Regions:
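N-terminal secretory signal peptides
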Residues: 1-20, 28-36
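C-terminal region of N-terminal signal peptides and the immediate post-cleavage residues
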Residues: 36-48
Length: 284
């Protein structure tokens, strides 16, 4: 999605990333083979570093995004969320802000219909194909919002939201973060950027934001300092947000992600305290 910040209502959304823990395990196995006298029991008991795809860290990520998108930590309450927020992208809905005007809502409903033919949203597929790329509600009104909320009670639709969130936004962000040598906070910064800006080729897309940051600093994988690079990335993100009036409130970066960065909390370890739109949030 090229997504809009919205301080309002609505619960839980991908090639598969290589988990950080798996790579660490393979590296450990190689070290054990090279040093057979090493105490295997002690080595295997050493805790592996966690990435954003660790379940507990992913839950934190969902809450952080929900605080910015829905002014609530209850991200699972957002499956049913749907409204036109006046950003030119038609209806925005669900746990990650799927939009009728940007194609990802169409992809979601197609996935749901493949898994559950004849569902309450399937009849809107022709209309969703027609309005893709526009802010039109043609063929959707008046019943689409009501039917979306009805579908959101179906665990199959909830799972479809989760899976599309992971395929389009979460997994690519984590993969790129790992490639760049970033820890949990950096992976989250990438994820939040993709949620709002998408991963297209326009000047404010995630990949363009990353390229802008790379002109100022190198990520750890290229020998750079992680904090310095992340500050450059967040600077580039703020620049991108300010290019569009609807995104001009940068508090989800300046009073959230920058706070964690300045505190040196590169692994997003609780407790976490931050603000978005002036509202305070806490994860213990």
């Amino acid at each position: 999605v090229v997504h809009i910040s919205r301080p309002v209502d609505g619960p839980t959304p991908t090639p598969t990333p290589t988990p950080t823990s798996r790579r660490l395990f393979l590296a450990l196995a190689g070290a054990l083979a090279a040093a057979p006298l090493l105490d295997v029991r002690r080595a295997s008991a050493a805790p592996a570093a966690k990435g954003l795809d660790d379940p507990a860290k992913k839950e934190i990520a969902m809450k952080l995004v929900s605080s910015a998108e829905n002014s609530s930590l209850d991200w699972k309450a957002q499956y049913r969320y749907i409204e036109d927020i006046g950003d030119g992208r038609g209806y925005t809905a669900g746990i990650i802000g799927f939009c009728s005007g940007t194609g990802d809502m169409l992809d979601l409903v197609e996935l749901y219909s493949d898994r559950k033919p004849g569902n309450v949203l399937a009849r809107y597929l022709p209309a969703l194909r027609q309005v893709d790329g526009t802010d039109s509600h043609s063929g959707l009104d008046p019943d689409y919002p009501k039917d979306w909320r009805k579908a959101a009670q179906d665990t199959a639709f909830q799972q479809a939201q989760n899976d599309e969130r992971d395929r389009v936004y979460f997994d690519p962000a984590v993969r790129q973060g790992v490639t760049d040598g970033l820890r949990v906070l950096g992976q989250f910064a990438y994820y939040d950027a993709i949620v709002m800006h998408g991963d297209g080729t326009d000047p404010t897309s995630f990949r363009s934001i990353r390229k802008r940051a790379l002109t100022k600093a190198k990520p750890p994988a290229q020998g750079g300092d992680e904090t310095t690079y992340l500050m450059a990335f967040l600077d580039a993100r703020v620049w991108a947000m300010k290019q569009e009036e609807a995104h001009s409130d940068t508090s989800r970066v300046d009073t959230a992600q920058r706070v964690f960065l300045r505190n040196g909390n590169l692994d997003l370890d609780p407790p976490l305290d931050w603000k978005v739109y002036g509202d305070s949030y806490h994860i213990g």
